[in-house]
Amino acid sequence: ASATWGAAYPACENNCRKKYDLCIRCQGKWAGKRGKCAAHCIIQKNNCKGKCKKE
């Protein structure tokens, strides 16, 4: 799901993708800390959705 999220919001992707990609890398590299990384990802994703709606 995380891999296709950006495609659903093309207008915001460039603005948010860098920070969101950090989440994806975090989830991939730190499996033991996935809960913390996932929580950060959810926050980041919601922030980007909010920006997208405003645009």
Swiss-Prot record:
Which cysteines bridge via disulfide bonds?
Answer: 12-52, 16-48, 23-41, 26-37
Q: Which residues form a coiled coil?
A: none
Q: Which domain of life is it from?
A: Eukaryota
Localization (cell)? Secreted
Q: Which UniProt keywords apply?
A: Disulfide bond, Hydroxylation, Ion channel impairing toxin, Neurotoxin, Secreted, Toxin, Voltage-gated sodium channel impairing toxin
Q: What is the effect of changing residue 13 to Q?
A: No change in toxicity
Q: Its GO CC terms?
A: extracellular region
The UniProt-reported impact of residue 9 to F is:
5-fold decrease in toxicity
Residues recorded with modification Hydroxyproline: 10
Molecular function GO labels: sodium channel inhibitor activity; toxin activity
Consequence of mutating residue 21 to A? No change in toxicity
Please describe, based on the UniProt annotation, the reported consequence of changing residue 34 to A. 80-fold decrease in toxicity
Question: What is known to happen upon mutating residue 18 to Q?
Answer: No change in toxicity
What mutagenesis or variant effect is reported for residue 33 to N?
No decrease in toxicity
Q: Does the keyword DNA damage apply?
A: no
- UniProt keyword annotation of Disulfide bond present: yes
Q: Which family does it belong to?
A: Belongs to the worm B-toxin family.
Protein function: This toxin increases the excitability of nerves by delaying the inactivation of the voltage-gated sodium channel (Nav). Only acts on some crustacean. Is more abundant, but 15-fold less toxic than neurotoxin B-II.
Q: What is this protein called?
A: Neurotoxin B-IV
Supply the source organism for this entry.
Cerebratulus lacteus
